[in-house]
Amino acid sequence: MGLEAQRLPGAEEAPVRVALRVRPLLPKELLHGHQSCLQVEPGLGRVTLGRDRHFGFHVVLAEDAGQEAVYQACVQPLLEAFFEGFNATVFAYGQTGSGKTYTMGEASVASLLEDEQGIVPRAMAEAFKLIDENDLLDCLVHVSYLEVYKEEFRDLLEVGTASRDIQLREDERGNVVLCGVKEVDVEGLDEVLSLLEMGNAARHTGATHLNHLSSRSHTVFTVTLEQRGRAPSRLPRPAPGQLLVSKFHFVDLAGSERVLKTGSTGERLKESIQINSSLLALGNVISALGDPQRRGSHIPYRDSKITRILKDSLGGNAKTVMIACVSPSSSDFDETLNTLNYASRAQNIRNRATVNWRPEAERPPEETASGARGPPRHRSETRIIHRGRRAPGPATASAAAAMRLGAECARYRACTDAAYSLLRELQAEPGLPGAAARKVRDWLCAVEGERSALSSASGPDSGIESASVEDQAAQGAGGRKEDEGAQQLLTLQNQVARLEEENRDFLAALEDAMEQYKLQSDRLREQQEEMVELRLRLELVRPGWGGPRLLNGLPPGSFVPRPHTAPLGGAHAHVLGMVPPACLPGDEVGSEQRGEQVTNGREAGAELLTEVNRLGSGSSAASEEEEEEEEPPRRTLHLRRNRISNCSQRAGARPGSLPERKGPELCLEELDAAIPGSRAVGGSKARVQARQVPPATASEWRLAQAQQKIRELAINIRMKEELIGELVRTGKAAQALNRQHSQRIRELEQEAEQVRAELSEGQRQLRELEGKELQDAGERSRLQEFRRRVAAAQSQVQVLKEKKQATERLVSLSAQSEKRLQELERNVQLMRQQQGQLQRRLREETEQKRRLEAEMSKRQHRVKELELKHEQQQKILKIKTEEIAAFQRKRRSGSNGSVVSLEQQQKIEEQKKWLDQEMEKVLQQRRALEELGEELHKREAILAKKEALMQEKTGLESKRLRSSQALNEDIVRVSSRLEHLEKELSEKSGQLRQGSAQSQQQIRGEIDSLRQEKDSLLKQRLEIDGKLRQGSLLSPEEERTLFQLDEAIEALDAAIEYKNEAITCRQRVLRASASLLSQCEMNLMAKLSYLSSSETRALLCKYFDKVVTLREEQHQQQIAFSELEMQLEEQQRLVYWLEVALERQRLEMDRQLTLQQKEHEQNMQLLLQQSRDHLGEGLADSRRQYEARIQALEKELGRYMWINQELKQKLGGVNAVGHSRGGEKRSLCSEGRQAPGNEDELHLAPELLWLSPLTEGAPRTREETRDLVHAPLPLTWKRSSLCGEEQGSPEELRQREAAEPLVGRVLPVGEAGLPWNFGPLSKPRRELRRASPGMIDVRKNPL
């Protein structure tokens, strides 16, 4: 919509094509017995509403039409026109809950099965497939996603965009233009589906009474295709400088709503008002365009924003298809009629469709940059839906075949090029075996032979190593051009013929494989349908046919929801047991097929149900064994989602719960089949087909899930590898920059040291100047100049420190890049491991699927045998049903023919009361028996608990006994030891009396040690005696436990005694009541035998009506329970879809993060390059500064030489004056000695003249100033006076030696006033003349 198309004069009239799609009845509608009010005739394109309202449309799709049929009938022609340059629009119209969003495919974006994919995913997959097949096309595809909510625009791809920033305008050609909407360039189906899911997450949805996930806004998904370059023959060829631009709009309108039905309040009510007003405006536009009498009148496009967006689609420049979705339920009769009326009017709308061209110059520069980037990745990585293509027409068959062959040739040549390069590398390997090397050499020779044969055929379709453009021009020159062209044509025709032959072989093999696969799939589907039908009949046999089995009979595909509007940072959803929508047998929006209502006896299906459930449990067990090999959390979630374990449990529980019956006995439960009105509340014609999840379907779903996961991981791995490459390049750039920065850091450190030295010297001089008393204004000005320069030096030091810190931060980038590179490599390795696991799992699933198919073929024989048995049982059941019907007719005739008197009625009522009392006695007897059984169970539990406590107590008592025995043993041991010590003490005492003094000392020590040991043993014996007297043989915790056990056992004994008394009492009462019941039963039979036939029939009718009432109440409860289970199933499905959306968002977040990191690395590379360039510029600037400084020094040197020359001339003049004063040398010398000051002044004056400008020049470094001040005068200055006379004059030498100390004394005085840093001196132009080396040499050596 943001593109401007130029309309050509030759416009094609294209009427709006209308397709009608009828959705199946919803499970809730089937549950409440809603009737279908539509009769569909798809072959005639006609539908009848009610009895006498007939409508005809271009396409009519019945309830059993799949998504593929909708796409082929409605969208496939539009896609072809889209590639031919026409604008196309497809929009869904209908009431809320009629299946519009499901048809468009926005609700099933995350679905893994092909049958659930809607229009948008299929169209985008087909578009990218066509682009991939046509390599000669240069295409650019970009998409946008817009929402109209409460008459305000919202960009679903850029949620932060304000509504006021999106404006709808018209250009000078009348085209509708949307400004401010984000358009994203896409290269594959995965990107489109990711954008759709992202937009659906931001779309407004909500719950109403009619639809739990109702669209609360209109959405427009726009795909723009730009084609340039050479186009295939079946497509228009763009003119030079022209661009073929076409737009495809997928519009999902919100459904019309009735407030009373939807129960909308508050915000939902406001949304409903806005939706109905915009749909009313759209209906007015359709009515105005579709009414032949109103042609040329005003069309109210501006009444709503959605009508302004659809201006080109309705009556404008586009080919449009309208899909009207209706509900067949009789409760939606009025809404269905309204939709059919509008759809019928829309067939009269005529559009003027043209091919849209745009000048190439109008292409925005950003698109040019994006189009000039590298070749895009192949779209085969995306989730392209594999399906059969429609057979092309005879007019385009040859062109399409030629196009396909050209694409095949290009692909074969590319593969040959790659194989040639790889085999050349392989041939260079030393370890290649001889046979393999020979085969490789033969293949390379064959390829080179073909290359030499086709060496003249260069261009985009040539063979390996085709000639360049210059070679083509050289080969095509002269008279050989026609011969070579003919030879090339012949060679290419032969090659095309060979490739066609190979292609035909491949296609034949592919068709055989596809045919075999279709046969196997059809056979498997038939087997599954037969099993499902048998399950249906078995479920309908049982009396309690509602409730869970009814819910299982409703195809869960009807609950497929759209992704719900949810906060982006919501909590994690709870994992509930549910069936994933991908493995459900539902076809489309609430696709449930109606089964026949069969009346069977319970004994007729018990054996069949047992066998079928046994088979189902076997497959479930096999699936469970395979899943047990995985991790426990994943296995648990998988089993919950597929409900394999639940099916197995039900299969094992049902056969045991069925009582065995030997004969076809008639019971009250079987009378339900003949009771009118006992099946449903709203009607007796509700038909439900019970369907179970076949193991093969679950296996296919797991296969598709694993394949999708592998594809997504492959894309993430590729993106991570690209990011790793960017990180490697960034690391190399950072290393190069680190080397430069290291050098720069060293230079900055040297410069900083120099600046610090200058700063310290300047501060020192400044302190010296401040310490002295300033005499004049010049010194004060110099002091201020020093202070200013010190401050400048300090700021320069600070700047250098900051530069050093910034440089160090840049140096640390390399280490960070290395760390991130290692982390990304670990992530890629982990992803590869996951990919390997998924591939192994994929192989296992494939093997399991093969085993299941083999097992299904074996089960088929058993199913046929069961069918024969079932037919026999059906005959028996039919006989019983006829008997029941005859009995009812007889009962009705008897009740109508007899007149019951009032006394008989009272008697019947008394008998009924008496029977009710007897029934109550029986019920009381049963309740008493149940209570007795409960008491017995409780007593058993108490006895078991007492047994456990007794065992624990026995253990503690045995432990106490063992402790007591151990203590007794300790006492015996201690006593024996004491006796032994007593004997030793008596012996030692005798030795002590008889021994010597030395031995007595030793014996006393031994006696002391023995007495100490005796005392300790006595204490130990006392402690043991105390324990035995106190009975503390166990630890305090064990003693407390033993005490508690005694108390608990005592309490249990009391409880057991009480239970025994209660049981005895109940048994006594039951024995008495049993005798009474036996007597009552005899009396009951006697009284019933005395009743007349009319009284018996009347009494039976009373009880029959009571049973019917009870059955009605039970059925109402079952319906309520089924509704609750359906709500639970919907919530579980919502949780599943949210989990899928969350997983997709995680992958998308990972991809976006990878892209951002890649962009960041590219920005870092640019920053490093700029930093490197800036650093080079800085080095160049410093080099230029040094060169300028050298030039300034050379200029100063020239100036000093000029001053030197002037001083020589003055000195020569002074010497000449001295010679002319007299001829006596002694007097001249004495005068020179007497008046040295004048001569010094004459000698020093010019020197002071050239020293004074130094104080006024630009600042210099302290070292330069010190060198200039303290450097000795050049030797040429000392020799300059000898140019005109003898050099050995001692008088003149003494004069010069006398003058030199004066110069030494004068210079230090000026040193204090000299600045510590000099700059270039300002001199006249004539002084800037640089002296040549020859002149300098002449001046130094004048002789």
UniProtKB/Swiss-Prot annotation:
| Phosphoserine modified-residue sites | S898
Residues annotated as region Sufficient for interaction with NPHP1? 513-775
Q: Where in the cell is it found?
A: Cell projection, Cilium; Cytoplasm, Cytoskeleton, Cilium basal body
Q: Where is the Kinesin motor domain?
A: 15-349
User: Has the keyword Secreted been applied to this entry?
Assistant: no
Q: In which tissues is it expressed?
A: Embryonic stem cells, melanotic melanoma and Jurkat T-cells. Expressed in heart, lung, liver, kidney, testis, retina, placenta, pancreas, colon, small intestin, prostate and thymus.
Q: Which residues of this UniProt protein bind ATP?
A: G94, Q95, T96, G97, S98, G99, K100, T101
Alphabetized CDD domains for the sequence: KISc_KIF4
From its record, what is one biological process in GO terms? microtubule-based movement
GO MF terms held by the record: ATP binding; ATP hydrolysis activity; microtubule binding; microtubule motor activity
**Keyword Transferase annotated:** no
Disordered: annotated segments: 356-382, 451-483, 611-639, 1219-1238, 1310-1343
SUPFAM superfamilies noted in UniProt: P-loop containing nucleoside triphosphate hydrolases
Keywords for this protein: ATP-binding, Bardet-Biedl syndrome, Cell projection, Ciliopathy, Cilium, Coiled coil, Cytoplasm, Cytoskeleton, Disease variant, Intellectual disability, Joubert syndrome, Motor protein, Nucleotide-binding, Obesity, Phosphoprotein, Repressor, Ubl conjugation
- Summarize the impact of E987K: In ACLS; uncertain significance; atypical phenotype
Q: Name one Pfam family in it.
A: Kinesin
Q: According to the UniProt record, where is the region Interaction with SMO?
A: 358-1206
Give the residue spans that cross the bilayer: none
The annotated region (Interaction with DLG5) lies at 358-479
Its primary localisation, in coarse terms, equals other
What family does this chain come from, according to its entry? Answer: Belongs to the TRAFAC class myosin-kinesin ATPase superfamily. Kinesin family. KIF27 subfamily.
Q: Which disease is it linked to?
A: Ciliary dysfunction leads to a broad spectrum of disorders, collectively termed ciliopathies. The ciliopathy range of diseases includes Meckel-Gruber syndrome, Bardet-Biedl syndrome, Joubert syndrome, and hydrolethalus syndrome among others. Single-locus allelism is insufficient to explain the variable penetrance and expressivity of such disorders, leading to the suggestion that variations across multiple sites of the ciliary proteome influence the clinical outcome.
* Assembly behavior: Can form homodimers and interacts with microtubules. Interacts with GLI1, GLI2, GLI3, SMO and SUFU. Interacts with NPHP1. Interacts with SMO and DLG5 (via PDZ4 or guanylate kinase-like domain).
This chain's function reads:
Essential for hedgehog signaling regulation: acts both as a negative and positive regulator of sonic hedgehog (Shh) and Indian hedgehog (Ihh) pathways, acting downstream of SMO, through both SUFU-dependent and -independent mechanisms. Involved in the regulation of microtubular dynamics. Required for proper organization of the ciliary tip and control of ciliary localization of SUFU-GLI2 complexes. Required for localization of GLI3 to cilia in response to Shh.
Name listed for the protein in its UniProt record: Kinesin-like protein KIF7
Q: From what organism does this protein derive?
A: Homo sapiens
